Amino acid sequence: MTQFNPVSQPAGGQASFIAVDWGTTNLRAFLMNQDGHIQAQRDSDRGMLKLGAAEFEHVLSDLLGDWLTPDLPIYMAGMVGSRGGWQEVPYLHCPIHLDDLSEHLFWLTTSLPNKVAIVPGLRSTGVAGLLDVMRGEETQLLGALDWLEEQDRAAESPIFCLPGTHCKWVQIKQGEVTQFSTSITGELFARLNDESSLVKGLPKSDQLNEAAFQKGVLASQQAGGILHHLFSARSRFVCGELMADDVRDYLSGVVIGHDVSDVLSSLERPTVPVLIIGSEALSARYALALSSLNLTSEFLAANEASIRGLKRLASRQVKSAVYPAIGA
């Protein structure tokens, strides 16, 4: 797995806008300069799930403090625009060019001196023809495309993988999102790893047991389906094929292995590296699963992708010099 260098570093210069990544559990704000680099960062644990509808503005105001000035527009991405967030913002229908997100920002009515916008999520169909949605990942995808353009790779059409609680697999052609599919991979593994009989009484570790993980990935590629393969964690342990400290990473390999192979079996085989956007640790697991299928991958940190995406949205607003009406 090739790892990209960070796309933004702490920098000086004149502040230009504020980028906000507001997820279910955390809130991060970045003061950005005119070149799109970070001047300062402020973090909070006041994610969407911890707030009532009337609390969002107050929480943001407290966090930003002296950043609250009329000449610094605020661009927010993530679950802040979901049902249960600050304001539910309608999904945009795919196919859609990611640069067109800047034309569909939802401008909030607030008592803050800054203009405040939420980036809309996307709605499409997955590989099974079923409805699918994303919110927050669209901004990361825009950031990834911006990076590819900077590297003179705009003509490439990689498959994008955004692992997490719900993993997104995205197809983009010439900057246009054509289709994406969501897997409940992370949430499923969390339940199995915390509550299931498969791991009861077994040790936990923060370190990846790569050999055990690879065994799980290989099991996922056999006949029988995921339900059968999951139980094999128990049977292989009690029969001595797995050690106690193998089981959790074996389960992770089964779940991630199925995510990778099940989705990719419905798509054309990638001819360029799969672009993984996420945390380094989780992305490394996906890279291992991809390599078992003789596929290469590249890694871009989710935080870096979000910042770059919001920077691109902000720059397009400045170029157009037009801010839509509030509440639109």
Residue ranges and their predicted role:
Residues 16-55:
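Short glycine-rich, Thr/Ser-proximal phosphate-binding strand/loop in the N-terminal lobe
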Residues 17-21, 73-75, 158-162, 275:
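Short glycine-aspartate micro-motif
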Residues 26, 271-289:
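Glycine-rich phosphate-binding loops at beta-strand->alpha-helix junctions
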Residues 51, 123-154, 158-163, 168-219, ...:
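Glycine-rich phosphate-binding loop plus the immediately following alpha-helix
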Residues 61-73, 151-152, 260-270:
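Phosphate/pyrophosphate-binding loops at sites that engage ATP/ADP/AMP, CoA/4′-phosphopantetheine
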Residues 67-131, 174:
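Short beta-strand-loop/turn "lid" adjacent to the catalytic site in phosphate-handling enzymes
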Residues 219-262:
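Adenine-nucleotide phosphate-binding core of ATP-dependent small-molecule kinases
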Residues 298-328:
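Glycine-rich phosphate-binding/hydrolytic loop that grips phosphoryl groups
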